[in-house]
Amino acid sequence: MAKSDYYDILGISKNASDREIKTAYKRLAVKFHPDRNPGNLEAESKFKEIKEAYEVLLDPKKRAAYNQYGHTAFDQGSSNTEFTSNADFSDIFGDVFGDIFGNNRRKRSNRGSDLQYNINLSLEEAVKGISKEITIPKLERCNICSGKGMQPGTSAQNCSTCNGQGQIQMRQGFFSVQQTCPSCRGKCKIIRFPCRNCSGQGRVERSKNISIRIPAGVDNGDKIRLSGEGEAGKLGGSSGDLYVKISVKEHPIFKREEHNLYCEVPINFAMAALGGDIEVPALDGRVKLRIPAETQTGRLFRMRGKGVKSIRSGHQGDLLCRVVVETPVRLSEKQKSLLKELGISFVGRTGMYNSPRSKSFFDGVKKFFDGLTN
């Protein structure tokens, strides 16, 4: 399969300056770095391709050879000429990966995996906060070898293949390039007597109970990070983190939108027409709500400070009650008679006055049909 053009890989022109090459490399390296894409083989392959293009184009001699001969400049047997790249990657990797991934790449490669635990909360628990205890299976540091991976009383020895350097020199066309040592895999040392308890990995699988304090005001999708509670790292590497993801169950009464709570409050016909006081639910108890006379369905009443407290700002949200005027059902004969009498009183001009929205609607309907017949 033909290799891609190095300039195309970095997205730069053939006249790009060293600064433009570095800028393009930093941007792409951060995006496709294996530490940001764990287990993604396509991203890992792309990262190697980007690094190769950068190494060639930043070195004046390699770039000149590539511009003249293309990829054939690096094929085995092309020439007896040999030189080693002096390109300094320390500044690039320090700038790009120092802040994002940490400074010690060897320890980073041994870092334990992050874990995620999904926890379900009721709305009350999410709003008020609560302590929970969870049990998770994970890789913990071996207590026999203290995470070192070797039998107690023994020590690791320098790798004889790379002389403890972690890398070996390989010939590639014009150049000598460094590759990770296949014997020690870049670790510089070889464990001759691995720990029997953890098979030389420095960690074993076991379940752990962890207490979590859920702060008041969390919402769906929020994550709580517990530093160092992920899986133990390989051979003494640092532990990963545990992320607790919040899922809030649906509530039978309240709906939540950010820091506000919403609920529907049914009221009867008489209460809507004449007004009065009712009690409505809130998460901290019942609250009195005054219904004005002539209240219509859909009217919102705001009860300040009865919502959810923001974790970040401390602002307290509101409770919004939407009134629904309920049509009476299962009427007695007396109630039907009274309602008929009331309905008769709405006929004529008095009815138009009592039901202005009905009058406006039917006036509009009349104009609509009059327009069709004209």
Curated annotation (Swiss-Prot):
Its main location: cytoplasm. Belongs to the DnaJ family. It comes from Wigglesworthia glossinidia brevipalpis. This is Chaperone protein DnaJ. It is found in: Cytoplasm. Its cofactor is Zn(2+). Binds 2 Zn(2+) ions per monomer. The J domain is necessary and sufficient to stimulate DnaK ATPase activity. Zinc center 1 plays an important role in the autonomous, DnaK-independent chaperone activity of DnaJ. Zinc center 2 is essential for interaction with DnaK and for DnaJ activity. Homodimer. It holds the Pfam family DnaJ_C. Keywords: Chaperone, Cytoplasm, DNA replication, Metal-binding, Repeat, Stress response, Zinc, Zinc-finger. CXXCXGXG motif repeats lie at residues 142-149, 159-166, 181-188, 195-202. Participates actively in the response to hyperosmotic and heat shock by preventing the aggregation of stress-denatured proteins and by disaggregating proteins, also in an autonomous, DnaK-independent fashion. Unfolded proteins bind initially to DnaJ; upon interaction with the DnaJ-bound protein, DnaK hydrolyzes its bound ATP, resulting in the formation of a stable complex. GrpE releases ADP from DnaK; ATP binding to DnaK triggers the release of the substrate protein, thus completing the reaction cycle. Zn(2+) 1 binds at residues 142, 145, 195, 198. SMART domains: DnaJ.
